[in-house]
Amino acid sequence: MEDDFLVLNIREYIKMGKAGEDMLRQVFSSFKCEKNLDVESFLTEQSIDFTKKNQSVTYIVISPDKNNIVGYFTITIKPITVNTDEFSNTVRRKIARVSEQNSDNGKYSLSAYLIAQLGKNYDDSIGNTISGDNLLSIALGKVKELQYMASGMVVFLESENKDRLLDFYEKQNGFKRFETKVTKKYKENSHTLVQLLKVI
């Protein structure tokens, strides 16, 4: 199914200068995600700057038939600290190979791939052309390409604390919870995010 979609690194547009960035903004203008406005605003307002500053890289997913953006994802690398007490021995051993353990608390510190954004386009004009499973699978495929070139073994993401989303990541896609954090971006709307990881 992933082969049915075109996945483009937005650097390909950015390297063309202003004309390329204008093209990107035109593509972004058709992306709608009313279920999570932060996902929509990141793409339209921040993804270009973050990519230019090497803070993260955003990939857009295009349907080949209608040439519409059906989704996007953003990847970066971040340090994490993991308590592996609830993990299987196999997962624990794999994490231990690429991390340092704190002798005081037993937690592991490591660098991991972060899928920082994952968003579907809910614009009515394009229809429901990609599933969440397919979009996540495409993002994980891109992480595995990076793994092939630069090593690494762990990918993680942050989810809102909602059963529907957590079931999607845990039951359907094999991620495991390892921490929670309270967002500090908007104090008046602060909320808890659940951090989940997967060994790849």
Pin down the residues of each PLM region:
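Short strand-loop-helix active-site module centered on a catalytic nucleophile
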Residues: 138-143, 162
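Glycine-rich acyl-CoA binding loop
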Residues: 127-139
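His/Cys-centered metal/cofactor-coordination and adjacent catalytic loops
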Residues: 159
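Non-catalytic substrate-recognition and accessory regions of acyl/acetyltransferase enzymes
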Residues: 1-127, 141-156, 167-200
